[in-house]
Amino acid sequence: MGNLSFFVMMGQVLGASIPPMLLPLVKDMHVSSTKISQLASWGTLCIGLGNVWALPTVAYIGSRYTILIGLAVFTAGFFWQARAQSYESLLAARVIGGLGGGVVEALGPVVVVLLFPREYVARAMSVYTWALGAGAVFGPLITGYAVDNLGSWRYPNYIFGGICALNLLVMILMFPEPLTNIRVAGDPEPSDISIESIDEEQVGEPKEPLEEVGNAQQYETRPASVATFEPCKPGALWFRRSFFLTLRHNHPPPNFFYLVVEPFRILVSPAVIITVLLFGISIAGTIATSILVSITFSQPPWLWTSGQVGLYNIAPLLGLLAGMPFGGAGADWLAERHLRRNGEFKPESALPILLPFAIATPIATTLIGVGFQRGWHWAVVGLFWAILNANLTGGCNVMISYCTESYPKKAIQIGVVVNVIKNVIGFGVSYSTLDWWMKDKYFMFLTVALVIFVLFVAAVPLWISGPSITRKTKTWVGYEEE
């Protein structure tokens, strides 16, 4: 989980590290500040599109190999950026690196579902969503100080590439295939024959092409087998977990393109639609704020250096940390309380956590725009930026936890859809940030705030009638209960 979260965080670093480099890149590449700011947008878009190849590749070669290939491409992208001699080369490096780095975002939710009991899913998911936001903080922070103290925008890319290479090495050694019921030739026979037949069905039986495609990697989201085996040697266990090849034991549907588009069937679920849009608009708001911070505070009367711009990103980091207790432990506490009182687990029991975020987030988003337009003190703008980011680990985390708990066998599909669409939304908003801001000023942030408020209001029916909505939408996507 730690390796995965770190990879996710570095993916956000790719998109967020441009603002402190903006002025040095303008001078070095001889292009406008608008084109340089769009490098962040293209990185965000390609991180999202990189999720698309996650499900098909996992179905064929498994999660471990998929993540290692993606991380290798992602790492090479940073070193390519550091050596780029033209704007076009720099853009190409960010596009290809983003396509490699995006795959891990889709696999985060499914690994959480595999590794943690349902009553701990929100807490574990808050670490994942924190990593999604933390990269947008540490990227500018490290970049700003590296540019100021080392004198070139190239050095941060070498630093990030080295960090990713180290993470790649650690993942090769310590990140196993995460499915929990691997059985191959030579295993001790389980004592219960019926349990053995279940395991063979989960791992060994070929899947029909028209069967639910999420189950092309069905073992990824099924509960672990209850069979108990004799302990084996650590070396043999590591070798099996490290070199287990899915294709030898599970036959995914032959239509690769169908595997690419199949996750988007989950969009018939209102909960997933709300989650996708809430994540996308919230991240778009914080990306737009980051871009405007680098432009506004680098000009008179502030005249901030790249290091000061990077240091300012501590504000959203504090917001992410503030949101975690609400979206993680707070949501789990509500779910556990409902379980104790009623004897059943109900994902909707955590949704009241959304109320404070439904009030605070739209107000803070609007006041960010007002603060930029009226020249408010940087500390005031930073406070509202922190509140906006608290929604990522708070309200957004509650929604993605709700989705994965309501459709546990669709965790990877939910991860793909959420990350693709949120990054496409983030790309669209951030790509047009400067032009939109020059035209509408604070009305830009008011529009974002109103959309966020409407999405929170749209979540109310899920709290009231969530179980019936979930049952209905499960039939639409062909969801089969255990």
Where are each of the predicted segments found?
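C-terminal transmembrane bundle
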Residues: 8, 12, 41-48, 55, ...
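Helix-breaking motifs and short loop linkers at transmembrane-helix boundaries and internal kinks
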Residues: 29-30, 53, 58-62, 83-89, ...
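Intrinsically disordered, low-complexity terminal tails of fungal membrane proteins
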Residues: 1, 176-259, 335-346, 472-482
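Glycine-rich segments within core transmembrane alpha-helices of 12-TM secondary carriers
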Residues: 120-143, 147-148, 158-167, 171, ...
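Juxtamembrane cytosolic amphipathic helices that cap and anchor the N-termini
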Residues: 1-3, 86, 250-282
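C-terminal membrane-cytosol helix-exit motif in multi-pass small-molecule transporters
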Residues: 164-185, 331, 335, 459-463
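Cytoplasmic helix-loop-helix junction between adjacent transmembrane helices
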Residues: 93-132
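Extracytoplasmic
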Residues: 2-33, 49-50, 104, 108, ...
